[in-house]
């Protein structure tokens, strides 16, 4: 098995890590940074930009710059809040209510999986360059509270990126691996994971190589983005009140406001007060308008109080599900950049009675844990057992619109469970199996994962046929369901597909499309390298020419200068074949003239014919 990497595919930033010399370490990306913004953009020239380079141009290209896409992955249109869709780029839905992201630059729509795949592809390419060997396999983390559709969609993103996803693991579980790798004594830890778009709490028993998840709870619609949005709305409302102009309808202003809000939020984690400067945010007939707004930490915390309070419920629920009191928790591990907010840290301390452990980097700990899991699969790390759980209950619809649970939440995975059902009416020869995920008693309150039909049931009185329904969850948390009629042995099975409904053909088409952009990106980078080499060659040649003495004929010098001029003109065009030919011509001419200069210098040296003393 080749090198397997661990990837934290985050809402705001992503990180890739690998085992090196027996220890997990974060991989530096092509820009020399340890984290990569989860941002993808397409320029008006149809060029693909990913990461930091995409983030830098967001203000001038807001409608074609896509961020926080993880909030949409594996979700239907009706499952996304109105607030989450308040973005500089446009989010719509297709005829099946699947989320689509509009890209005016290419005049086409993307699925969230396709956008996420471009981030994954960059991480894999950076890992390949850094490690000096091709990387094609990865362990990818997801929020613990991701449902089956969201997990399947993440797997699809990996396929589109050309990555073999060996394992999907929960982010808090990955963080616990990183924290507890060298722990010998048993500890009960609470992982509080507040990222850019999702929130998870997991409680685990850690020690002596065993990592057992006791419970998990969370909110997949709560994260740092929501704190940013509160500030954006505050700025929009304040500006509207003062100037009677609604900045919410201006996509460029909205992008600038979003960036300024994030910057202010980050600053207020270390200082008590900051000022938001946004010159020339818009203009009307009276002239340009500016924003210069002071923001204190107290005001920020008051604005975000409702969000901070939402963090309370999953902590209490997780403790209750694990049948533990806060006194039973030995350590609190903070994960995600949003846990740097002082009010969040204060909440955690008040709920648990303990100061959070600060020994791990909240931005990198999940990727480090994913790398450890990758190392386990690749045989680089041994003697570790990971016992994860399913975050939500799974079941089927039964008579009267009731959800009958087959696998309860917080059940250790992998797991297989069966229940017996029967027909509802006389002489019924088929049954519809409607698969659900959630905690509500009625079907309407839960997420529908899909359905299938079992035909060939012998005609009989209601309640007579015996239909065995088996739910099977694998180590990735992906669900398969099988229904079997006991008398005839007839059966039907289905692996639940993600809400994106991407079939194999669609995934293959998206992979080809993604590879096309990756190939174009590679060619573009190679061409830039050629131009840089050409400039360096011209510089060296000019330096050499200036050192020539009268022993080199003037026509030879002039030829070099002409070749340099031709190359500089070719650099301004995109004719790279011509440029390469001219570079070779200059190299040959320089070799000839340097050899000639050396011969002439030797011939004119009065000491050259003397023997060594």
From Swiss-Prot:
InterPro entries: ATPase_NBD (IPR043129), Chaperone_DnaK (IPR012725), Heat_shock_70_CS (IPR018181), HSP70_C_sf (IPR029048), HSP70_peptide-bd_sf (IPR029047), Hsp_70_fam (IPR013126)
CDD domains cross-referenced by the UniProt entry: ASKHA_NBD_HSP70_DnaK-like
One GO molecular-function entry: ATP binding
Disulfide bonds: none
Subcellular location: Plastid, Chloroplast
Transmembrane segments: none
UniProt keyword list: ATP-binding, Chaperone, Chloroplast, Nucleotide-binding, Plastid
GO cellular component, one term: chloroplast
Cited PANTHER family: HEAT SHOCK PROTEIN 70KDA
Task of the protein: Acts as a chaperone.
Family affiliation: Belongs to the heat shock protein 70 family.
Protein's recorded name: Chaperone protein dnaK
């Amino acid at each position: 098995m080749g090198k397997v990497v661990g990837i934290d595919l985050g809402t705001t930033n992503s990180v890739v890590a690998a085992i090196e010399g027996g220890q997990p370490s974060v991989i530096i990306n092509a820009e020399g940074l340890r984290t990569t913004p989860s941002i993808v953009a397409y320029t008006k020239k149809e060029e693909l930009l990913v990461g930091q380079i995409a983030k830098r141009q967001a203000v001038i290209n807001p409608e074609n710059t896509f961020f926080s896409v993880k909030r949409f992955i594996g979700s239907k249109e009706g499952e996304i809040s109105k607030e989450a869709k308040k973005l500089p780029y446009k989010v719509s839905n297709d005829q099946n209510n699947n989320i689509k992201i509009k890209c005016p630059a290419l005049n086409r729509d993307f699925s969230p999986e396709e956008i996420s795949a471009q981030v994954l592809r960059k991480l894999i390419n950076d890992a390949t360059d850094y490690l000096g060997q091709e990387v094609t396999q990865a362990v990818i983390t997801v929020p613990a509270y991701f449902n089956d559709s969201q997990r399947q969609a993440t797997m699809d993103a990996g396929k589109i990126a050309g990555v073999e996803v060996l394992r999907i693991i929960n982010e808090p579980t990955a963080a616990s691996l990183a924290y507890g790798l060298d722990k010998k004594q048993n500890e009960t830890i609470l992982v509080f994971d507040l990222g850019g778009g999702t929130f998870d709490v997991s409680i685990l028993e850690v020690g002596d190589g065993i990592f057992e998840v006791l419970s998990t709870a969370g909110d997949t619609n709560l994260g740092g983005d929501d704190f940013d949005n509160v500030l954006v709305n505050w700025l929009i409302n304040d500006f509207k009140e003062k100037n009677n102009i609604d900045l919410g309808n201006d996509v460029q202003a909205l992008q600038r406001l979003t960036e300024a809000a994030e910057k202010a939020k980050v600053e207020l984690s270390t200082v008590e007060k900051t000022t938001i400067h946004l010159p020339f945010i818009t203009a009307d007939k009276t002239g340009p308008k500016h924003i210069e707004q002071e923001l204190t930490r107290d005001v920020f915390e008051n604005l975000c109080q409702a969000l901070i309070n939402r963090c309370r419920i999953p902590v209490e629920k997780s403790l209750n599900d694990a049948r533990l009191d806060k006194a039973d928790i030995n350590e609190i591990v903070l994960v995600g950049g949003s846990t740097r907010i002082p009010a969040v840290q204060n909440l955690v301390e008040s709920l648990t009675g303990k100061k959070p452990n600060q020994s791990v980097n909240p931005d990198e700990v999940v990727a480090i844990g994913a790398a450890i899991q990758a190392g386990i699969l690749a045989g680089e790390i041994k003697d570790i057992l990971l016992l994860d759980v399913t975050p939500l209950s799974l079941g089927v619809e039964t008579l009267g619109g009731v959800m009958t649970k087959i696998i309860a939440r917080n059940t250790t995975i992998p797991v297989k469970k069966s229940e017996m059902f029967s027909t509802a009416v006389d002489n019924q020869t088929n049954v519809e199996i409607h698969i659900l995920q959630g905690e509500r008693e009625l079907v309407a309150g839960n997420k529908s994962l899909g359905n299938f039909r079992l035909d060939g049931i012998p005609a009989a009185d209601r309640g007579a046929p015996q239909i065995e329904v088996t739910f099977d969850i694998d180590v990735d948390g992906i669900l398969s369901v099988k229904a079997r009629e006991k008398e005839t042995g007839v059966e039907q099975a289905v692996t639940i597909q993600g809400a994106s409904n991407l079939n194999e053909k669609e995934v293959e088409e998206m992979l080809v499309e993604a590879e096309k952009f990756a190939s174009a990106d590679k060619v573009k980078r190679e061409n830039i390298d050629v131009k840089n080499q050409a400039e360096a060659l011209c510089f060296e040649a000019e330096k050499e020419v200036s050192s020539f003495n009268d022993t080199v004929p003037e026509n030879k010098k002039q030829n070099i200068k002409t070749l340099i001029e031709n190359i500089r003109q070719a650099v301004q065009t995109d004719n790279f074949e011509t440029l390469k030919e001219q570079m070779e011509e200059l190299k040959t001419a320089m070799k000839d003239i340097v050899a000639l200069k050396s011969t002439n210098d030797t011939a004119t040296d009065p000491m050259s014919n003397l023997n060594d003393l």
